[in-house]
Design a protein with these regions (language model features):
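A short, polar/charged loop/turn motif at coil->beta-strand junctions and beta-hairpin connectors
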Residues: 5, 45-47, 210
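An anion/phosphate-binding loop that grips the pyrophosphate of nucleotide cofactors and donors
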Residues: 74
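Inter-motif core of Ras-like GTPase G domains
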Residues: 77-79
């Protein structure tokens, strides 16, 4: 029988990366999966719920009994990786504790700054506990990985990469649909803006004196 968890995932982070934590929680909890995949796997349309993130639930700090309980009742651990979190004692303790629970395969890394395995404390993004525990080779989702020309699309790809790992589905199974939805939104926004500009231009012409209207129409 599968264990029941209160939280789908626990986000571990350093306070310098709090904005990324909030953004990630919002992205994951709000992600709508396709009806086809939901039907195949028995998911809800928003399957990654709820996410435990300290600012909205409890003040971060030491690895208190309360935080330990939240880790115990979380199916996955998501570590926001940056040079700040790499130097954080408490991020290391949260990783170590989750590892001790026997859920190492459910530890996921989301890289927002720095470089993996750089060997330089100023740029290294993985906490040293990762090497100390001998965790398997890690390829975290990296928001700065240059796959596309546009940085916002690289970030979206990293979000979907993490989502695919959390749900245990092929990346392409959800990425292609996600891209189509993004492009559809961009087209809709562009058409909406053009429509507004066209309306404003028409209103401007209507409100001009007659001789100005004639000049505008002639041009």
């Amino acid at each position: 029988m599968q264990p029941q968890y209160k939280f789908f995932a626990f986000i571990s982070y350093n306070s310098h990366d709090i904005a990324w934590g909030k953004r990630l929680q919002r992205k994951l909890e709000g992600y709508r999966m396709s009806a086809t995949l939901c039907s195949e796997h028995g998911w809800q349309r928003k399957p990654i719920n709820p996410i435990f993130f300290a600012p909205s639930d409890i003040q971060p700090g030491g690895l208190t009994e309360e935080l330990q309980e939240r880790l115990k009742t979380s199916r996955h651990l998501i570590v926001i990786c940056s040079p700040h979190s790499a130097r954080s004692e408490w991020v290391g303790k949260e990783i170590e504790y989750f590892h001790q629970l026997g859920r190492t395969k459910n530890i996921h890394f989301f890289i927002v700054d720095g470089e993996p395995h750089s060997g330089n404390p100023d740029t290294e993004c993985f906490n040293p506990i990762v090497e100390t525990l001998g965790l398997p080779e890690i390829l975290g989702a990296n928001v700065h990985e240059q796959i596309f020309r546009w940085s916002w699309l690289n970030k979206e790809r990293a979000y979907v990469q993490l989502i695919s790992k959390l749900l245990g589905v092929e990346f392409d199974a959800i990425w292609q649909r996600h891209k189509r939805l993004l492009y559809s939104k961009i087209i809709a926004w562009t058409l909406g803006i053009l429509g507004i500009l066209s309306t404003l231009t028409s209103v401007y012409i209507i409100n001009q004196p007659t001789d100005v209207k004639v000049m505008l129409n002639e041009t």
